[in-house]
Swiss-Prot record:
Keywords: Amidation, Calcium channel impairing toxin, Disulfide bond, Ion channel impairing toxin, Knottin, Neurotoxin, Potassium channel impairing toxin, Secreted, Signal, Toxin, Voltage-gated calcium channel impairing toxin, Voltage-gated potassium channel impairing toxin, Voltage-gated sodium channel impairing toxin. This is Omega-theraphotoxin-Gr1a. It comes from Grammostola rosea (Chilean rose tarantula). It holds the Pfam family Toxin_12. The presence of a 'disulfide through disulfide knot' structurally defines this protein as a knottin. Coiled coil: none annotated.
Length: 87
Protein backbone atom coordinates (compact mmCIF):
# COMPACT_ATOMS: atom_id res chain seq x y z
CA UNK A 1 0.00 0.00 0.00
CA UNK A 2 2.80 2.42 0.91
CA UNK A 3 4.57 1.61 -2.35
CA UNK A 4 1.47 2.46 -4.39
CA UNK A 5 1.05 5.80 -2.63
CA UNK A 6 4.75 6.53 -3.13
CA UNK A 7 4.44 5.77 -6.88
CA UNK A 8 1.37 8.02 -7.16
CA UNK A 9 3.12 10.91 -5.36
CA UNK A 10 6.23 10.39 -7.49
CA UNK A 11 4.06 10.42 -10.65
CA UNK A 12 2.35 13.64 -9.58
CA UNK A 13 5.73 15.26 -8.88
CA UNK A 14 7.00 14.24 -12.33
CA UNK A 15 3.83 15.58 -13.95
CA UNK A 16 4.23 18.86 -12.06
CA UNK A 17 7.83 19.24 -13.28
CA UNK A 18 6.78 18.52 -16.88
CA UNK A 19 3.96 21.08 -16.72
CA UNK A 20 6.27 23.73 -15.27
CA UNK A 21 8.80 23.16 -18.08
CA UNK A 22 6.04 23.38 -20.68
CA UNK A 23 4.78 26.62 -19.14
CA UNK A 24 8.29 28.12 -19.19
CA UNK A 25 8.64 27.24 -22.90
CA UNK A 26 5.26 28.84 -23.61
CA UNK A 27 6.32 31.99 -21.78
CA UNK A 28 9.49 32.16 -23.89
CA UNK A 29 7.38 31.72 -27.02
CA UNK A 30 5.12 34.62 -25.98
CA UNK A 31 8.21 36.80 -25.44
CA UNK A 32 9.61 35.87 -28.87
CA UNK A 33 6.30 36.67 -30.58
CA UNK A 34 6.13 40.02 -28.78
CA UNK A 35 9.66 40.88 -29.97
CA UNK A 36 8.77 39.98 -33.56
CA UNK A 37 5.67 42.19 -33.42
CA UNK A 38 7.70 45.06 -31.99
CA UNK A 39 10.25 44.65 -34.79
CA UNK A 40 7.50 44.75 -37.42
CA UNK A 41 6.51 48.22 -36.16
CA UNK A 42 9.96 49.44 -37.18
CA UNK A 43 9.28 48.84 -40.88
CA UNK A 44 10.47 51.87 -42.85
CA UNK A 45 7.79 54.22 -44.06
CA UNK A 46 7.25 54.43 -47.82
CA UNK A 47 9.18 57.25 -49.41
CA UNK A 48 7.38 60.08 -51.10
CA UNK A 49 7.34 59.71 -54.89
CA UNK A 50 8.69 62.38 -57.18
CA UNK A 51 5.61 62.04 -59.43
CA UNK A 52 1.91 61.39 -58.86
CA UNK A 53 0.64 58.01 -60.07
CA UNK A 54 -2.60 57.10 -61.86
CA UNK A 55 -5.73 58.51 -60.10
CA UNK A 56 -3.50 60.53 -57.77
CA UNK A 57 -4.37 64.10 -56.78
CA UNK A 58 -2.52 66.76 -58.78
CA UNK A 59 -2.52 70.49 -59.40
CA UNK A 60 -0.79 70.53 -62.81
CA UNK A 61 0.36 68.02 -65.45
CA UNK A 62 4.00 68.28 -64.38
CA UNK A 63 3.01 66.71 -61.03
CA UNK A 64 1.98 63.47 -62.79
CA UNK A 65 4.22 60.56 -63.84
CA UNK A 66 5.10 60.08 -67.56
CA UNK A 67 2.13 59.32 -69.88
CA UNK A 68 -0.27 60.88 -67.37
CA UNK A 69 -1.88 64.30 -67.42
CA UNK A 70 -3.65 66.30 -64.74
CA UNK A 71 -7.35 66.42 -65.66
CA UNK A 72 -10.16 68.19 -63.89
CA UNK A 73 -12.53 65.46 -62.69
CA UNK A 74 -15.13 65.84 -60.01
CA UNK A 75 -14.42 66.28 -57.05
CA UNK A 76 -10.74 67.09 -57.68
CA UNK A 77 -7.94 67.14 -60.25
CA UNK A 78 -6.46 63.68 -60.87
CA UNK A 79 -3.69 62.15 -62.98
CA UNK A 80 -5.12 60.10 -65.85
CA UNK A 81 -3.62 58.54 -69.00
CA UNK A 82 -2.87 61.18 -71.61
CA UNK A 83 -3.17 58.79 -74.57
CA UNK A 84 0.55 58.58 -75.29
CA UNK A 85 2.56 55.34 -75.50
CA UNK A 86 6.26 54.56 -75.49
CA UNK A 87 9.13 55.01 -73.11
Amino acid sequence: MKAQIFVVVLGLAALSVLCYGSEADESALHEEIFQLLAASDEVPKPQERDCVRFWGKCSQTSDCCPHLACKSKWPRNICVWDGSVGK
